[in-house]
């Protein structure tokens, strides 16, 4: 290699620059000049090459020497490779010859081994066949057949002529034993012979046909049940079902043509036969089959001790069978004729009775799915709804007779449906809806308005009609409750919300009765309020010469009105529980009005206070028609008796009353009573506010908070204090300081 040449060491950028300069200079010359210039450049290049060769002559000679030596080495290596290749061919020929010899010997040995195996297998088959012919025990025969199983299936042994007779005997014997075992299995299940069933299952296990045999057995059970269902749906007599062939796996059931329309004398006759047959099918035949399945499960548990495990385990067999039974029933219900579907829907309670009876006989080991009978519920519920509505059809004003018919139907339908909680809930919802319709019909007849509210005279025609409607509603409520009481035992056995649904449906009847009573009560309360307010016009309460014995005139009027209004307008209602509640509310309201009016009554003399004390006692007598036992009212009754003592107490005694939550008498009552002991300058709160007695009573009714009432009293006390200061009065009313002190204590006691 030539190195160190200045020209060669030029950078690419410098070379490009020289070329560009040369090209630029040549572009300005003529052709002849360009040729001369090129020739000159070529000559220079030639001289430079010669100079480089002279300078690098030694290096070039050394490189040429190395190239010759490398060529000689390559030639020597090629000769060595050729010698190795020839040696490899010789070794391959030697190995191939030996391998072919070994392979030929191996094939000979393999054929000898196959022949030996066939001879041993044939010998084993002949030996086992001889044992088979000499053995009588079925279980031992099955074990021998288990050993012969692979030999019989061996394809190579099938081509050996001298053992064909033995093979045919073994195959025939196996078939006979399987048929006999199948019959023994069926017989053992029918006769409840557990040992016989276990032996049959062991034999099938030795034949490796246990899975198939169990599947065939289940298929036979289902096929027999399917045929029984067809006979039942065809309307055949129960005797036909009783004579139907028992489970026989070895003999297939004879094929039957498609069902034809049953020749029925009457629909009633068909339904009687249908339900009798279906009950027998579920309650007896299916029970018998389930009992056999349970025995089969027990037998499988025993053979599992021998290490048998498969999909048809003792736990799986009952589940598979029951799933197939329910699938068959579901399919039969879906595909049965229209008249059978209608019969099933209308008699669903009978079907459920048979089904639940079967579950009880089986001790709950087999349970029907709730969804199985769901498609039939719609028709059954529709039939029940039609029966309910038939009682109300064409009746604009239901009476007790209508209610009796309605309850009679309800009791019948609920009694039939109580066998199943889901069905009972559905019927309860239908009952609630139809009961609402009955109440709606009665509600449409209720009279509202001024004429239906009057209480000053005997009940008019509208009020009599309202009372009659309320009594019909109560009769309906009472009849429903008696029905629920009669069915109480059945409701306890059937879990569900049916009882609660029916009980809640009575709330509308309570609401309507309350509506009728409420308008009368409002009129009574209004009249009582007017009568009690008249005590402010009672003559002589400020006189010391009035009589303190006997009731006041307003109290006599109140007693007469309460007695008359209760006996003429409220006592006529049959719902005594509701009227008792109304009586208590009226009594509490009457006491409240009386107390409010008494505590603001002023001025009062000592005789007047004694008269009011007597009026408190007469008030108890006046309330007897409303509440015979006033103690049931609780605090209002105690407050009335306390007022009979407070009204005659002095101001000093009044301010000693207990204050706070433990106090029987509210603080505002005591303060209002104290105003009655004060002079005219210390005006009552309503007088200060320019209110009438009526307005104050209304205000007290509308403001139940103790703080609001104390604030009203505070305004009156503040007004008195301001007036006293403005008039420069040196001495306050003697009651005023006691009132202020009591007021402050009451204010602090507020929560």
From Swiss-Prot:
InterPro entries: Cog5 (IPR019465), COG5_helical (IPR048485), COG5_N (IPR049176). The keyword RNA-binding does not apply. Residues 1-21, 244-263 are annotated as: Disordered. It comes from Drosophila melanogaster. Keywords: Developmental protein, Differentiation, Golgi apparatus, Membrane, Protein transport, Spermatogenesis, Transport. One of its GO terms (biological process) is spermatid nucleus elongation. The keyword Transport applies. This is Conserved oligomeric Golgi complex subunit 5. Belongs to the COG5 family. It is found in: Golgi apparatus membrane. Required for normal Golgi function and necessary during spermatogenesis. Required for cleavage furrow ingression during cytokinesis in dividing spermatocytes and for the extensive polarized cell growth that accompanies spermatid elongation. The gene is fws. It is a peripheral membrane protein. Disruption phenotype: Males are sterile. Component of the conserved oligomeric Golgi complex which is composed of eight different subunits and is required for normal Golgi morphology and localization. It holds the Pfam family COG5_C.
